[in-house]
Amino acid sequence: MTWGFLKQGIFRERSRVGKQKFYHCVSRYFHYLPPVLAILLPVGSWPFLSEQQWRYSYFLFPVVSSLGWLFAIGLRERQLRAAAGQLLETKIRKLTERDEGLKNIRETIEKRQKEANRLKLHNDKLVERLGQAREVVIQAKGRYDHMEEKSRKLHEENKQLQMQLEAAVRERNEKILENQELRQELKETLAYQQELHDEYQATFVEQHNMLDKRQAYIGNLEAKVQDLMCELRNLLQLEVGAKTELPGRPMASRDVVAQLVLEFRKIVFRVETTEAADSLTALRYTRTDPSAHNYSLACRQLFDDLREENLGMLFIYAPFAQRVLFANALFKDWTGHGLEDFLNKEGDVVLEGFAQWERDLLTESRTERSGKIVIKTKAFGATPFYYCVVTLDKGPLAEHVLGVLYPAKASFFTNLSYI
């Protein structure tokens, strides 16, 4: 490191000597520059001056030239003084060279001068190093202050984290206590539910035994109901056979509609009575029979009963689906058409009264609706028919329409006997 500083000092000394030589050369000839500029400036600007400016130039140019010459003379005096000092120093050196004592003193002075220069150079190096050390100290102090500030912030963050940790620990302890309380409540709830389950299980077994007893009782009643149903059907059939005329025998033309409505009500009552009787049977309480099977069985039994009726052209119609569910064989026998043809507005089966006929079929009223329509039969042409319809109120075909059609003329059966 010492050799590096020494090389750096030598380089700086050489640079200083070179600069002194350059400045000495420049200062030697610099005193010629101001007078030359003082002379050339007015001469060079003379062609560019106006006539009015020429008047002032006679006064301006001598002043400028005088100032330039005064400046040059001052520089020259300083150079002469410097040259006199150098000449005096040279003479002193020559005198000291002749005298041995003065020569020794001079050498001593030169050595001390060199030592002073060396010390000065060393001092400059020390000052420079001191400046560098001061910069390092300042930087270290800045870093120390930065670290101190950072340490303070970290300390504050540590306090905040410690407070958060304590809050989290307290919350955790509270959650643990709450969890223990919830577990205790859950155990008590489970115990209570187990007691309820045992109680419900005992109640279910008791109710199941009671249902088995009632099922056995209902099974005993079923046989009695079936016997009563058979007797009721026999009585109804006897009543119908006594009061209802066969299709081959014409009704009285004066009260055909009233008698048709009366007989139709009996059929409706018989259907509803059948449904009520079926609802009392054990099939309603049997857990093994599905409801769809019971529904289809009840409908099939109802259709079989309606096929045995000979009041007229009986049918069952679903208004919400606009679909025919049942129609007996008299439709084909008397008219040669199916019930679907009677409901077709675009067809030519219903010649008169179609609007009222359609309105009565789609009406949701529970009362009987009756009327008259003219039908184009395949065998006899246009033939009037009375009709009576009603919306069923209960049973498997509730909300469906039950209806009957009957010829309005007694001659229809006379003509039918010839076919």
UniProtKB/Swiss-Prot annotation:
Protein name: UPF0242 protein TC_0906
Coiled coil location: none
InterPro entries to which the protein is assigned, alphabetical: UPF0242_N (IPR009623), UPF0242_PAS (IPR040578)
Pfam families per the UniProt record, alphabetical: PAS_12, UPF0242
Family: Belongs to the UPF0242 family.
Gene source species: Chlamydia muridarum (strain MoPn / Nigg)
